[in-house]
Amino acid sequence: LDYIYVTQQFGVTKDSKRLYASGSHSGTDFRAIVGTPVKSVADGVVLGVGDTDLTCPYASLGKFVFIKHNNGLSSAYGHLSLIKAYQGQKIERGEVIGYSGNTGHSTGPHLHLTIYAGDGAMMTTRPSKACPGRSYTMPLAPTSAYLDPLYYLPPL
C-alpha cells in the first residue's frame, strides 16, 4: 500500500478476544478501499494463492497471496478483491500482487498482512471449523512463527 493507516494491530488487542477463536490477531490490518494496489514487502517467490471463500464463505483470509522472501521471512496478504500473482512467480519488492478487498472473515475493506519467521509457515490443508465437512488450503504456522508486521516494515 502506498498510504498506511493501521486499523488493527498484531497480537492480543482490545478486539481480538471477541473476533478470533485464538484470542489473538495473526497479523496487522491496514485501511484500504477496495481496489487499492497491494505490493510485496520484499523480493521472493509466491508459494501459494487461493480463495478460502470457495470452500467456506466469509471465513478466514478470503482471497490471499503467500510469499517466501529471500530474507528468510514469509508473508501472507489477505482479504484481496483480485489476485495478480501466481504460484511459483518470482516477485520483487514493491511489485503489485493483488488489490485490496473485503473477502473472507472481514468487517470492511482492508489488507490483512501476516509475517512469518523462517520456514515456519506452509500451505496447509485443514478442516474448516466454520463450515464442518469442508477443508481449505491456506498458509499456516506454529504460533511461535507469527511475527508483528510493524517490526519489519519501514517506519509509518
Predicted segments, located by residue:
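Terminal peptide-recognition signature
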Residues: V6, F30, G44, G94, ...
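Residue-level structural signal for beta-strand termini and adjacent loop
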Residues: T52, L80, N102-T103, S128
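Solvent-exposed coil/turn segments that connect beta secondary-structure elements
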Residues: G11, G35, D51, N70-G72, ...
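A structural signal for short beta-strand/turn segments enriched in small hydrophobics and glycine
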Residues: V38-S40, G44-V46, G50, G88-S100
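Short glycine/threonine/proline-enriched tight-turn/helix- or strand-capping micro-motif at secondary-structure
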Residues: Y5-S40, D51
